[in-house]
């Protein structure tokens, strides 16, 4: 009994002690923000003073830590002054950190993944946070950067979800090569293949296989650094001649386990549509709408055709670890129903990254990524294979619902269903529902990526690092067409089965040294890299000839059976001549060094030498390019007062090569498409004296921050000259070849980029941040190859072409025009129609340049307590837009203009009257291969729009301490403040050179409204 009593008393005393101990500790949570910017700070060190008890703020700036009333919390962050807060009985402690004017600024990820302080850079570089791409998401995340950086131009393809985008820094430089920048993920260059992007042709049906940006989960992105000039990206060599986009993905933070969930749902509707007449009916065998006036208005068939699109973008991530081991895992998926019926897109992304210490000075990391994309009925610009042609051109007064529900009928002569339409012989347009169900393009893409690195800190100043990454892409494209597709062109059907494989193995070794001697500092890196790229492409292609008898004459033995055996029996084209296998290798050595004096003067030197397999058969198999730059922090050399936090002048000069297209220096044999088993010899002479393109780049500018970092600005002037361009010219007759390659040409770009921002924290509850950026680019063709009397055509369509001439600019547009008399009035022929002039350069008219000279963006963000309001207005001035869609609507009599003209009974042009049908069937496009007066269908590209708008609220500690939910109403492409073109000037046919600003039945750009949810634990 006494023993039990003793144990009871002991347990009671222990319990009281423990209760007292626990009563002395409690959990403190809070939010840490930048006082000047108002933004949450990620990765702030929060510790209990004098102890090892510490944590870090999460991706939303929140923290949670166990404390006692007598404790003092210490908050530390790079570039900010330390802060201390006494705990007492407080359970929520929010902190505003003040920028440290004495410390160097933000860390910037530069070429090869080398991190440097922004103040030491000798060239222009801008870093944007992950919030810029995941607050208002785009399926292709690069589109979320539109208008947010000076000098960055992004033009999405008109192919809908999963499509690629044209990305351009500082104008077009290369005439025959790519003008896209290099994409770098975590310091390593990635494959940027775009498989089958739309080319510059009217017919269409080309596939947009997407780009690497469309495979990235935006919620995995920590930051993006834009290296716009050659000096910034020179260490990457030829592949980065057009600049580089450095993407840093998220990693786990030591001592913190976090779970983040994101869900973004939007509804999409067409932002802008053509205007149609609904008063005059069809005629001419169910093709055109030049018939009599209807007794009642017709439906707007285009509005009937489109539906409200739906997109959901979800992701979840788990991250955690300690000082010795950290891991990050994420999964993201996208599902989209497009604005056109039967159009779907889905994608899955898996990402994992682990890093750990092997020893105290050896660090290892591994990463693995997988993405899968699937699309069905992806839009394709052009006349053929495009359901929009039927939806737009169907004769007014047609029973739309009948053809929608009965898009096919049985044909006993062929023994199968065939297309049912107002005119089944017309190749240019067909029943859109037949196309969506019986000409269905299906695309699937898999992308695998495995990488790793090892870093050894030999001394505090010296380390060596090795990295390797393997990537593989697998693309499969099927586009089978059932019997009667494209009018009578494929009466028994067509098979197309395309497979494209790409592999890249990259590796490098870097030695890094960093040391300070008194006022002097040296940062140096030397290394070597190799890149091995291999691609293969097989295209099974079978097509039938015109149907000539009930027995099924033609090349297809049985209709609608899409197998090689069915085509083998009556073979026309079973292997496309584009079937190929390529392999390329690039080895390089490089070095860069920066010398600093008193943290105020910095000198940069870098050099790289490439050995490319594409130059193996030339007189020189390598090319060398250097760069030099300097920056001076004037505020550290000259007293400027406390209001000047930074005033820096910088300048750089560099020479960067642009790699040579594969097989240009050596003969290449190919399969002959029209003779199975035969080999086709090349018709171009090998380029044995080949030299790589070289871009000479000069830039200088200044950066500044004032008034305790409230005001910041940046200005850069640049000038680039790209020489040794590649041209194909006629070969001497005696050579037996048709063409030969030569080096020639000089394309110059010069202009400026500027940005200014103001960041004001009015009080603890209210903050405002605004930024305005603007860029100007002037392009000039200084030299072309000799003997081009009529210039060089880089893109052409029916009655229009883009031509380069010495003294002209990249993107100069020439169009067909009507004949005029001495007084400038239109000339009539005997039939009362205008007279079209020819399509020679002497007859065509210069219509302006398709590229805008000025681009701008203006961002505003307001924080009030837990509310956040932000919007982006952007636009461009200049440029021209060509709309073959409008020309065709006129030629077919379905545009609003043609209806108004018939109501008026005439068309008056410069004082000359024409009958509406006589005028519009001549100047408009009455068939996809008929000439028309393109001069009337060129519009100004200038436009200003509300690009983004969001209003959000953060529910703090909703599910416990530090567990927050942020909900935001979001909108994208809301409306135009100004626009001249009848289509979206920023949507293009493809990513190739010279096809931006062209509308040939492009999918309308979308206006999206939705909800974004973010939950963090």
Placement of each model-derived feature along the sequence:
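Acidic, glycine-rich flexible loop segments
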Residues: 311-312, 383-434
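Short, small/polar-rich motifs associated with maturation and membrane association
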Residues: 1-351, 355-371, 449, 456, ...
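Extracytoplasmic gating/loop element in the C-terminal half of outer-membrane beta-barrel translocons
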Residues: 612, 876-966, 970-971
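Conserved small-residue
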Residues: 260-295, 538-552, 742, 759-850, ...
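Extracellular/periplasmic, surface-exposed regions of secreted and cell-surface proteins
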Residues: 180, 291, 309-312, 347-349, ...
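Short aromatic-centered micro-motifs
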Residues: 34, 46, 75, 183, ...
